[in-house]
């Protein structure tokens, strides 16, 4: 009953107005804020950290929980940095040409190792190049070493193939796991590769493997739908796809291809620069700093909330390195049919000020909702792409709530941060 009275009061008194900047410093803009979200347990990269581990791992480690390099071993320097940044390394048997003692030595040196990845794209002629019968001949040996070393085995990594008769990855899987001595009970996950050019295409591909009832590992992905993918298109693809992967409970892990590689001029997929100081690219900044959709985080009143750290999102929202004076990323393209949710924790019944740092190029509006109920529209003026402050006072009740911001027109809004402060 208390919540109902609160919503009625909000609907009755809520009025929105933009705070216009005055000459001089903008005292409403914080000098800095920190990330409070937890690292994603899913997020990783497919990469060999052999050349610049002392630079590359500190750059990616704050966001990455795991990695693999298509081989067995990891350098001592990289291993130490993986431990420092809480990254899990997964060795791989790339094809049937592997040695038990190599895996035994690795496991002895790395008792924390939990997974073993099986053959890399066996239905591609320039990769593992194994028909199901050939893979089955080696499979018992691989299952045996995984059990001996207490490693969870992940099924061969599948993509659309070039091996005659096995372009269809489902056909390869179905034939392989029907062979005597091979069983779905042998594996604890399915590895997949996908280079489609849209998040929807990736989702459709992944959904096709859910029939096997195993956790999905997307161990290679980026937009490589052609050899002419722009940096902007790649960034939008990455944000949309990672948002989908983080939200899908059937996706256990995913790994971006590739932090640094030869395809940069073709599809702009590099997370790391190829020249000194080898820093994060703009794409890398987004990969490292975008939302992990952390469901355990509740932002307390008085905390500056980076707009890119939404708890969940709807529609094709995008992110980019911010051009504001504070922050790392900005949320862009918040318009009709898109929304972002933030979990907030209010310490006591009181009136609080909601502050939005925004920019637009058209007069537009955002709908503000609390726990699924609309509180009203925030009418935003045209700021000519300049950053401005919007404020409104809200009476809020003690407890945890979900604050939602959704677009209402075709004209996009960019957000840098938001905050809720007691009057």
Question: PLM ranges: what are they?
Answer:
Residues 2-9:
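Sec-dependent signal peptide recognition
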Residues 88-90, 248, 252, 257-308:
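Aromatic-rich peripheral "rim/lid" segments of glycoside hydrolase catalytic domains that contact
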Residues 110-132, 154-164, 185-194, 218, ...:
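Active-site groove signature of glycoside hydrolases
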Residues 155, 161-164, 211-238, 257-273:
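Active-site clefts of carbohydrate-active enzymes
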Residues 44-113:
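N-terminal carbohydrate-binding/catalytic regions of secreted carbohydrate-active enzymes
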Residues 294-423:
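Extracytoplasmic
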Residues 91, 120, 172-225, 257:
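Aromatic- and acid-rich polysaccharide-binding/catalytic face
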Residues 16-39:
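Bacterial Sec-dependent N-terminal signal peptides
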């Amino acid at each position: 009953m208390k919540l109902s009275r609160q919503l009625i009061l909000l609907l009755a008194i809520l009025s929105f107005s933009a705070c216009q900047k005055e000459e001089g410093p903008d005292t409403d803009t914080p000098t800095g804020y920190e990330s409070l979200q937890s690292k994603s347990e899913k997020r990783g990269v497919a990469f060999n950290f052999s050349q610049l581990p002392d630079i590359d791992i500190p750059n990616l480690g704050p966001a990455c929980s795991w990695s693999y390099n298509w081989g067995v071993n990891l350098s001592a320097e990289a291993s130490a940095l993986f431990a420092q940044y809480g990254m899990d390394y997964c060795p791989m048997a790339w094809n049937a040409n592997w040695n038990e003692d190599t895996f035994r030595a690795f496991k002895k040196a790395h008792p924390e190792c939990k997974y073993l990845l099986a053959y890399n794209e066996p239905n591609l002629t320039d990769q593992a190049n194994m028909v199901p019968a050939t893979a089955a001949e080696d499979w018992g040996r691989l299952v045996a070493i995984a059990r001996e070393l207490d490693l969870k085995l992940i099924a061969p990594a599948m993509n659309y193939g070039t091996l005659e008769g096995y372009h269809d990855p489902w056909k390869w899987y179905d034939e392989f796991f029907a062979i005597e001595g091979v069983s779905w009970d042998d594996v604890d996950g399915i590895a997949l590769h996908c280079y489609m050019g849209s998040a929807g295409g990736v989702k459709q591909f992944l959904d096709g493997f859910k029939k096997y009832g195993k956790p999905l590992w997307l161990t290679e992905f980026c937009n490589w739908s052609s050899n002419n993918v722009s940096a902007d298109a790649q960034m939008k693809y990455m944000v949309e796809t990672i948002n989908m992967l983080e939200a899908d409970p059937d996706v256990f892990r995913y790994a971006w291809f590739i932090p640094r590689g030869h395809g940069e001029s073709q599809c702009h997929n590099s997370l790391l620069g190829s020249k000194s100081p080898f820093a994060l690219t703009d794409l890398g900044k987004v990969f490292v700093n975008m939302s992990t959709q952390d469901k355990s985080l509740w932002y307390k009143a008085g905390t500056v909330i980076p707009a890119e750290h939404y708890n969940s999102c709807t529609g094709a929202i995008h992110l980019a390195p911010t051009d504001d004076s504070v922050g790392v990323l900005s949320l862009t393209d918040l318009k009709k049919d898109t929304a972002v949710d933030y979990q907030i924790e209010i310490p006591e019944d009181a009136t609080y000020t909601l502050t939005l740092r925004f920019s637009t190029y058209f007069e537009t509006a955002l709908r503000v909702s609390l726990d699924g109920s609309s509180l009203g529209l925030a009418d935003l003026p045209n700021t000519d792409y300049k950053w401005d402050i919007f404020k409104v006072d809200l009476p809020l009740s003690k407890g945890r709530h979900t604050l939602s911001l959704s677009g209402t027109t075709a004209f996009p809004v960019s957000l840098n941060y938001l905050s809720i402060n007691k009057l």
